[in-house]
Regions:
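Short, non-ligating residues that shape and space the ligands of small metal-coordination modules
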Residues: 30-33, 55-57, 129-134, 151-152
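Charged, low-complexity interaction segments
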Residues: 83, 87, 91, 104-119, ...
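Residues immediately within or flanking Cys/His clusters that coordinate Zn2+
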Residues: 17-20, 44, 116-121, 128, ...
Length: 153
C-alpha cells in the first residue's frame, strides 16, 4: 500500500491575525502573523525566546488532533478490510467474522487559546508578533529574520 493520505487541520488566529506556535527547543509559546505561511519572503521562523530555527513549531493541541485523525483513519481502513474478508468468506468452508470494539476519537476543531502575550512590532522586518511580556522587557529575537531586538528604538 503506497497511498498517501493528507489531513487538513485548521488552526485559528486571534483578533490580530496571529497564530500560536510552540518552540520544540525551549517549549516557549509565541505567535506570528498568520499570513507568513503563504509568504515567500520568510524562509524560516526563529523562536523569539531562544532564537533557534526549527522545522516544526506545532503546538500540543495540533499534534494531538493530528494523531487522533490518523488513528481514526487507520482503524477505518482496518475495519473495511476485515468486513471485506467477512463478506468474502460468507459462503465458504472457512468463515470469518469481525466485530469492532474500537471507539473513534472525537476530532474536535482546535479552539483559540487565551495566552498572556503582548504585541511587538519588529522594526527589522516591520511585522508584528506576540511574545510573553517578560520577553518584551528583556529582549527577543525577531521570528521572521532572527535579529535580536531589545525594544529600544
Amino acid at each position: 500500500m503506497s497511498e498517501t493520505e493528507v489531513f487538513t487541520i485548521s488552526i485559528p488566529t486571534d483578533e490580530d491575525g496571529q497564530v500560536l506556535l510552540k518552540c520544540p527547543v525551549c517549549n516557549d509559546l509565541f505567535k506570528v502573523d498568520g499570513t507568513v505561511f503563504g509568504d515567500d519572503s520568510v524562509f524560516e521562523i526563529h523562536c523569539p525566546s531562544c532564537g533557534i530555527v526549527s522545522d516544526s513549531y506545532i503546538t500540543d493541541d495540533v499534534l494531538k488532533l493530528g494523531m487522533q485523525m490518523s488513528e481514526n483513519y487507520a482503524n477505518d481502513l482496518i475495519e473495511k478490510k476485515f468486513k471485506k474478508l467477512e463478506k468474502a468468506t460468507k459462503n465458504s468452508f472457512l468463515k470469518s467474522s469481525y466485530k469492532s470494539n474500537y471507539k473513534r476519537h472525537s476530532e474536535q476543531p482546535i479552539k483559540l487559546s487565551v495566552e498572556n502575550m503582548t504585541l511587538v512590532e519588529y522594526p527589522c522586518c516591520k511585522r508584528p508578533s506576540k511574545v510573553k511580556p517578560l520577553l518584551r522587557l528583556c529582549g527577543s529575537y525577531c521570528p521572521y529574520c532572527g535579529e535580536k531586538y531589545y525594544g529600544i528604538e
